[in-house]
């Protein structure tokens, strides 16, 4: 993976980039490009599982800025208000594309 942008510090409070290492949130290893809810051994909220979304630029642009509104009832939205700077959102998305 590339070096994480400063905005990722907010993400790593709950998420690991190591495969199979879940924290409060699921591991982000290989997350970009797959359907939500597929990190092994992580208990997702029913709202997340029902969303059917794919983790891509369009989804992340909305979700990272406002997780509560993008997937109502999800756990992340209850704890994290979102990244307010669009440049931070773009930097985190670019980084997640490199996290295998």
Swiss-Prot record:
Coiled-coil region(s) at which residues?
A: none
Transmembrane stretches, start-end? none
- Processing and modification events after translation: Binds 1 heme c group covalently per subunit.
Per UniProt, which keywords does this protein have?
Answer: Electron transport, Heme, Iron, Metal-binding, Photosynthesis, Transport
Xref: Gene3D superfamilies: Cytochrome c-like domain
Q: Could you mention a single GO BP entry for this protein?
A: photosynthesis
* Residues involved in heme c binding: 11, 14-15, 76
The Gene Ontology terms for molecular function here are:
electron transfer activity; heme binding; metal ion binding
* Protein family (similarity comment): Belongs to the cytochrome c family.
Q: What does this protein do?
A: Cytochrome c2 is found mainly in purple, non-sulfur, photosynthetic bacteria where it functions as the electron donor to the oxidized bacteriochlorophyll in the photophosphorylation pathway. However, it may also have a role in the respiratory chain and is found in some non-photosynthetic bacteria.
Q: From the Swiss-Prot or TrEMBL record, give the protein name.
A: Cytochrome c2 iso-1
Q: Which organism is it from?
A: Magnetospirillum molischianum
């Amino acid at each position: 993976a590339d070096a994480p942008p400063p905005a990722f510090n907010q993400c790593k409070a709950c998420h690991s980039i190591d495969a199979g290492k879940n924290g409060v949130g699921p591991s982000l290893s290989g997350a970009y490009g797959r359907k939500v809810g597929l990190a092994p051994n992580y208990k997702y909220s029913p709202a997340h599982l029902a969303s059917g979304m794919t983790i891509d630029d369009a989804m992340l642009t909305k979700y990272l800025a406002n997780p509560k509104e993008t997937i109502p009832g999800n756990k992340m939205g209850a704890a994290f208000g979102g990244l307010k700077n669009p440049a931070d959102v773009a930097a985190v998305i670019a980084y997640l594309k490199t996290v295998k």
